[in-house]
Regions:
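A detector of single, family-specific signature residues
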Residues: 1-253
Length: 253
């Protein structure tokens, strides 16, 4: 492209396939990334060459609206933050699975403790899994101060029956959850290192009500970037982020 003095490129954002091409051309070309919805060709025989020619014709006549594309480091931050969200969802799923195992085993820890993944509850569960048939062990050394007064309730809560199969499943769930916790911590180190140049922007964001966590602020920057000139107005920004969804139903219904 450079040998032919082609500095302007228009491309369709198809799946993930556009990303490596965009990354290669980004430093040397002016790229317009088009949503497939807005460069769809008329019906007929479709080929890659015909599609490329159609997109080129639209671009030549300035009929292609480019998608918002933040700088490369912001895109990397976005990718890592979205993966962090996925890991959090996996953890939530494992928490639910563990609670379901306890429920079918008539272990009602959730009725006594506020968090079955808290230190006291996990210590009790680990002790239970050492020998599921024995629930007569001493609870007091396993619980922290706030739960000392609830020892009778805890004793009743663990008076259930864990089958060998459920015990095995619980061990797998706990191991997977702990692994996810470790991988998430590693990922967060990468995210914090990548977000380090944006400390000023993060500090400004955290002055807004409800934005206290570093990762909440980083998540916002990873999605909308730091250059608000990319959006003509606040309304455009709100629309792009999905806070002002359109009504596509007839008669306003």
């Amino acid at each position: 492209l450079l040998n032919r003095n082609c500095k302007d490129v228009c491309m369709e954002s198809t799946g993930k396939y556009w990303i490596p091409v965009y990354n290669i051309l980004e430093n040397d070309c002016s790229i317009v990334l088009a949503h497939p919805k807005y460069v769809k060709a008329i019906r007929g025989k479709k080929t890659d060459k015909k599609d490329a020619k159609w997109i080129a014709d639209l671009f030549k006549h300035d009929l292609v609206a480019g998608s918002f594309m933040p700088p490369a480091d912001i895109r990397q931050l976005r990718d890592l933050m979205r993966y962090r969200f996925k890991l959090t969802c996996f953890q939530s799923s494992e928490k639910n699975r563990l609670q379901n195992c306890l429920t079918v085993s008539n272990i009602q820890l959730g009725n006594v403790v506020s968090d079955t993944f808290g230190k006291s509850a996990q210590a009790i569960l680990d002790k239970l899994l050492e020998n599921p048939a024995d629930t007569s062990f001493d609870l007091e050394p396993l619980v922290y101060k706030s739960l000392k007064k609830k020892l009778p309730e805890l004793r009743d809560a663990i008076d259930g029956y864990i089958t060998p199969e459920q015990a095995g499943k619980l061990k797998v769930i706990k191991a997977h959850y702990e692994s996810l916790e470790s991988r998430k911590a590693e990922l967060e180190e990468l995210i914090l290192a990548l977000a380090a140049p944006y400390q000023q922007e993060l500090a400004i964001l955290q002055t807004a009500p409800g934005i206290r966590s570093d990762f909440t602020a980083i998540g916002i920057i990873s999605e909308i970037g730091t250059n608000m000139e990319d959006f003509p107005s606040a309304k455009h920004l709100c629309s792009w982020t999905g806070f002002t969804p359109t009504n596509n139903e007839s008669e306003g219904k």
